[in-house]
Structures are given as C-alpha cells and as structure tokens.
Swiss-Prot record:
This is Phosphotransferase IIC component GlvC. The chain crosses the membrane at residues 12-32, 60-80, 87-107, 130-150, 174-194, 199-221, 225-245, 277-297, 307-327, 329-349. Is shorter than orthologs at the C-terminus by about 170 amino acids. Residues 1-11, 81-86, 151-173, 222-224, 298-306, 350-368 are periplasmic. Keywords: Cell inner membrane, Cell membrane, Membrane, Phosphotransferase system, Sugar transport, Transmembrane, Transmembrane helix, Transport. Residues 33-59, 108-129, 195-198, 246-276, 328 are cytoplasmic. GO terms for molecular function: protein-N(PI)-phosphohistidine-sugar phosphotransferase activity; protein-phosphocysteine-sugar phosphotransferase activity.
Length: 368
C-alpha cells in the first residue's frame, strides 16, 4: 500500500513541475501591467508594450487554465505499467469523452440533474470550460479519478489478444473503446452527485455571514482545504465577486468605498465587517514562506539545491500575485495531512486578524 501511495505521489509530481515557470510568467506579466511599477504610459491598453505583455500573460495561464487535463494526462506517466505514452493518449481521449458526455447529458437532461447548462461558466456557477467543453467543475479530483480508471483499464487490457479480424482494435484502441463505454455511467454519476456537493457548499453561505469570527474561520478553512476539488470557488466566488456578503461583491464594494473609509474616524471593522471574508490572501503571503522552508529543510541535503530551484519561483508567485497552486499542490502530494494543518493555520490566522480589527480586500498577494 505504501509503495502504491508513493507511486501515486510521484506520478502527480510530474504535472506539478510545470507550475513554477508558468507562475513566474504570469507574475511578471501582472507586475509589468501595474502602473505603480512601469508608469501609466506603458500600461495604456493601446501601447505596444501593454499588448505584448498581455499576449505573454495569456500564454502563461495555459497550465493554470487546463490543470485538470494536465493532471489527467500526467497520472499514467507514473502509474501505467507499460507503454506510458499510449496510456497518456488513452486517458486524454477518455477524459475529454467524459466531459463531452457530461455536457451532452447536462444540456439534454439538465433539469433532471438540477444543473443549468445554459448559464455562462463563471466562478460560482458550478461549470467550467475544459478544452472548449462546458462541463461540471470537478477540478483535479475528477481528473485524477477518471485518469485512474482509464490507467487501470490500460494496465489490464492493453496486451489483451483479440481475434485476427479485430486486430486493428487491439492495444490503445481497445482501451479507448472500453473506456468510452465506462465514461457513460461515470458522466451520469458525476451529474447525479457533484451538483449536490456544490449545493451543500452554497448553503453554507448564510451560516458564514451570520457567524462572526467563527464564520471567518470556517470560510478561510474551506477556501484552503477545498482547493484540490475546485469547490473553493463556491466559497470565495460569491463573497468576493458576488452578493453573498455585500452587493456587487467585496472586491467592488471595497474599491467603491475606499475613500469613504479613509475619511471616517470609526474603526474599519465597524464600517466594513464583511471585509473579514477577504483576509485569506494573508496565508498566501506569510504561509508560503513557512511551507517552502519546511520542504527545503526536510529534503535530503544532496537534493536541497534542486528543491530550492522548484520552491523559490513557486513561493514568489504565491506571495506576489496569490497564485498558490504550484506550491500548495506540491505540498499536498508530499503530505496531505500537513496540507490540512495548513488550512487550519490559515483559518486561524485570518480569524485572529479579524478579531484584532483587520478587514479589507486581501484575497490575493502583495500586489493586490
């Protein structure tokens, strides 16, 4: 069992290695679009500099916007017993097939499943765009499950001998054919169960709003612990960008009333208590350093230079722009238990700050 867990962790580490460079590109691009750093003239949308930076930034988002697909394809590299390249191909085709089935079933029988597939795939909708397919947002959890199923089929069926007249379907084609049939009930079960999980998360909003400091703790804890599932969007999305806390979302409300807050002699917490739900970014700034140092000093001495090369860009990305996936996914696969401890500490940090009267729009990194 331990060896299988280690193999799984090693397989998941392959896509994680793609995050640091992508994070650096996005972080630098965001910096270069900030007028405080480069001046107003260079950040003008009509300037050649701003246009080039925007193009580079879009390329940098590739890994982050396609995380489920990348994790799905990355799993067979470590878990397929043979023909890893062919296993990756089978997983990619099957994962996309699963999402197409979800889309088709959702569009056809959406009312039965309680999912509105006609709405836009935005944060809080429960939907996402995956390789151009509107589908349920199951994040890397769905990707890992489907990839694991197809990889298991590959390990069992890739070498299976078929009759001579069916020889053209032997190998990868046979795996994909069987996986095609398996993806139908998988898509059905996903549509049947996942929206209920999403609705359960949404129902927490009323409790979070009315629970004061406890609500801030639970909010921040769930926002961190649910990152691997994609369900964290249901936690922060409606608070930061939607009307769960204030009309228009905390981010817009903060920008609109910032001058009013600065002129008032009242404590900021009494003026804007809802700002306690936007303190989760502080763990990205301060917690990232602790996570990185822990991984560095627990690494074997001969590997510390390599580990530092991975951790430094990931940590800077988390601290500056609040993109924590490169660091937290590495952390998650190394020690899931400590990732849960990290979520507890992040929640406790936000709650203590809130109790001391600190509120505001602090959901991102230092630049935010």
């Amino acid at each position: 069992m331990l060896s299988q867990i280690q193999r799984f962790g090693g397989a998941m580490f392959t896509p994680v290695l793609l995050f640091p460079f992508a994070g650096i590109v996005v972080g630098l691009a965001i910096l270069l679009q900030n007028p405080m750093f480069v001046g107003e003239s260079l950040t003008d949308p009509n300037s050649l500099f701003a246009q080039i930076v925007h193009i580079i930034e879009e390329g940098g988002w590739t890994v982050f916007r396609n995380m489920p697909l990348i994790f799905a394809v990355g799993l067979p590299i470590g878990l397929a017993k043979q023909a890893q390249g062919r296993a990756c191909l089978a997983v990619m085709v099957s994962f996309l097939t699963w999402n197409y089935f979800i889309n088709a079933m959702g569009m056809t029988w959406g009312s039965y499943f309680g999912v509105d597939f006609t709405q836009d795939a935005v944060a809080g909708s429960g939907l996402t765009m995956m390789a151009g397919i509107k589908t349920l947002d199951t994040s890397i959890i769905g990707a890992i499950i489907i990839s694991g199923i197809v990889t298991a089929l590959h390990n069992r069926l890739f070498d299976k001998k078929l009759p001579v007249f069916l020889g053209i379907f032997q190998g990868t084609s046979y795996v994909v054919i069987i996986a095609f049939l398996v993806m139908i009930p998988c898509a059905w079960l996903t549509l049947l169960g996942w929206p209920k999980v999403q609705m359960g998360i949404e129902s927490l909003q009323a409790f979070l709003r009315s629970a004061g400091a406890l609500g801030v703790w639970v909010y921040t804890f769930l926002e961190r612990i649910l990152i691997p599932t994609g369900l964290h969007h249901f936690i922060y999305g409606q608070f930061i960008f939607g009307p769960a806390a204030v009309e228009g979302g905390i981010q817009m409300y903060w920008a609109q009333h910032l001058q009013e807050f600065s002129l008032s002699a009242e404590p900021l917490k009494s003026l804007f208590p809802e700002g306690g739900f936007a303190l989760h970014g502080n763990s990205k700034i301060f917690g990232a350093v602790g996570i990185s140092l822990a991984m560095y000093f627990t690494a074997a001495p001969e590997n510390r230079v390599k580990v530092a090369g991975l951790l430094i860009p990931a940590t800077l990305t988390a601290m500056l722009v609040g993109i924590t996936e490169p660091l937290e996914f590495t952390f998650l696969f190394i020690s899931p238990l400590l990732f849960a401890v990290h979520a507890v500490l992040a929640a406790s940090m936000s709650t203590v700050m809130y109790l001391f009267g600190v509120v505001g729009n602090m959901g991102g990194g230092l630049i935010d």
